[in-house]
């Protein structure tokens, strides 16, 4: 018996949605057999990998419609960094009852990967482990989570339109246009930017400075700022995420603390030579025109991890950024609400201070809002943040 969950997901070009609602989600082989004209989203390397993997009965993955348990995955990220815009894509939600079909197959990762096992329903001993990827928010190559988060339900030939429960798109304007394109059929079209690695909201304060509510580690900024202490411990908050997802950053952080290169009021810039896009996208190392480097700015907001954050040290660090960003080659910058949340400082104090300094930068800057509690709208206004 399969545990219940809400939906599975199919990633497609938004122009294909009307046809999908009429004919269903077809396997690529079935699309070719029926000579259906559709907009393809996958490049040749992805196509060849899926065509070439054969099952024991000699069927190719090309004969199956593939549904993901978690659509916010490396494959979707790849499509977006290859040049497709969020508005070009739709995520088709499929009722979990498709799993009751006896002819489906389940994979424990990206089906095209040689490391992935493909199971019949009767062969699976613990489906919960596979389905748990629906709760994953990020991934790494080293521990296999990058492959596992792309676990699939493979449906032979076609997913009947009756199984389709909703369509997710990137914003309200796209949703409105799609509703018209499908003649306002009785199916929900839901704008959800987080599915497409977009922030929940963005508030533009100046030409270069914005407030963002979302996951900073999916920012396309060249330099990501991480709040740290000066004793080399990454235990909670964003720092603990960095320690797990980017262990090389943690090693550099500890070394900088030991050598006193990172001090209170003086951030340390780690000019990492690898691309976050390559790290996050499926087969990202083979893609061209990526963000070539993702740097990390280690910004001390407290002296010891046991202490609360100190506003004076934060101001000194902001001053360092203003004085050094050009010389260091920082081209764009993402910064969390320094010292807020676990640091114990209030946005009403930190926000205006950060904006006072960061408005001086002649580069794109995103301030990521604290998620621990909702900030009153009045404290997010240009008047409050820029005129204080």
Curated annotation (Swiss-Prot):
List the active site: 50 (proton acceptor), 152
Report the protein's function: A fusion protein of the toxic and antitoxin components of a hybrid type II/IV toxin-antitoxin (TA) system. The N-terminal domain ADP-ribosylates ssDNA on a thymidine residue, while the C-terminal domain removes the modification, neutralizing the toxic effect.
Record-linked CDD domains: Macro_Poa1p-like (cd02901)
Q: Which organism is the protein's source?
A: Thermosipho africanus (strain H17ap60334)
One family name in Pfam for this protein = Macro
EC number assigned by the record: 2.4.2.-, 3.2.2.-
Q: Which domain of life is it from?
A: Bacteria
GO BP annotations of the record are: peptidyl-glutamate ADP-deribosylation
List residues of the DarT domain: 6-197
The name on file for this protein is DNA ADP-ribosyl transferase-DNA ADP-ribosyl glycohydrolase fusion protein
Molecular functions (GO terms): DNA binding; glycosyltransferase activity; hydrolase activity; nucleotidyltransferase activity
Residue positions binding NAD(+): 10-12, 50
User: Which reaction does this chain catalyze?
Assistant: an N-(ADP-alpha-D-ribosyl)-thymidine in DNA + H2O = a thymidine in DNA + ADP-D-ribose; a thymidine in DNA + NAD(+) = an N-(ADP-alpha-D-ribosyl)-thymidine in DNA + nicotinamide + H(+)
UniProt keyword terms in alphabetical order: DNA-binding, Glycosyltransferase, Hydrolase, Nucleotidyltransferase, Toxin-antitoxin system, Transferase
The yes or no answer to whether the keyword Kinase is present is no
The beginning of the lineage is: Bacteria, Thermotogati, Thermotogota, Thermotogae, Thermotogales
Q: Which gene encodes it?
A: darTG
């Amino acid at each position: 018996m399969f545990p219940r969950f809400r939906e599975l997901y199919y990633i497609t070009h938004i122009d294909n949605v009307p046809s999908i609602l009429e004919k269903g989600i077809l396997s690529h082989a079935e699309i070719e057999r029926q000579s259906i004209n559709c907009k393809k989203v996958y490049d040749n390397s992805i196509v060849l990998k899926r065509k070439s993997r054969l099952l024991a009965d000699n069927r190719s993955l090309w004969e199956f419609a593939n549904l993901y348990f978690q659509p916010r995955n490396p494959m979707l990220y790849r499509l977006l960094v290859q040049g497709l815009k969020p508005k070009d894509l739709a995520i088709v939600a499929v009722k979990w009852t498709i799993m009751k079909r006896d002819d489906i197959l389940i994979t424990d990762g990206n089906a095209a990967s040689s490391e992935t096992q493909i199971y019949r329903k009767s062969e699976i001993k613990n489906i919960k482990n596979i389905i748990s990827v629906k709760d994953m928010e990020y991934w790494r190559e080293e521990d296999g989570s990058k492959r596992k988060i792309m676990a699939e339900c493979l449906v032979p030939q076609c997913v009947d339109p009756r199984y389709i429960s909703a369509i997710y798109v990137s914003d309200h304007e796209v949703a409105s246009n799609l509703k018209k394109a499908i003649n306002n059929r009785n199916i929900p079209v839901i704008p959800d930017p987080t599915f497409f690695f977009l922030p929940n909201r963005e508030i533009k304060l100046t030409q270069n400075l914005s407030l963002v509510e979302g996951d900073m580690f999916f920012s396309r900024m060249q330099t990501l700022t991480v709040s740290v202490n000066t004793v080399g411990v990454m235990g909670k908050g964003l720092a603990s995420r960095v320690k797990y997802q980017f262990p090389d950053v943690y090693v550099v952080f500890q070394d900088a603390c030991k050598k006193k290169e990172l001090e209170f009021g003086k951030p340390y810039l780690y000019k990492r030579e690898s691309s976050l896009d390559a790290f996050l996208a499926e087969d990202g190392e083979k893609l061209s025109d990526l963000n070539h480097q993702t740097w990390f700015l280690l910004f001390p907001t407290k002296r010891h991890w046991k202490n609360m954050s100190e506003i004076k040290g934060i101001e000194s660090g902001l001053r360092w950024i203003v004085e050094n960003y050009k010389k260091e080659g920082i081209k764009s910058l993402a910064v969390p609400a320094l010292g807020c949340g676990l640091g114990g400082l209030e946005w009403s104090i930190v926000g205006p201070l950060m904006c006072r300094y960061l408005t001086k930068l002649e580069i794109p800057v995103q301030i990521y809002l604290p998620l621990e509690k909702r900030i009153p709208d009045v404290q997010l206004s240009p008047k409050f943040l820029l005129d204080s």
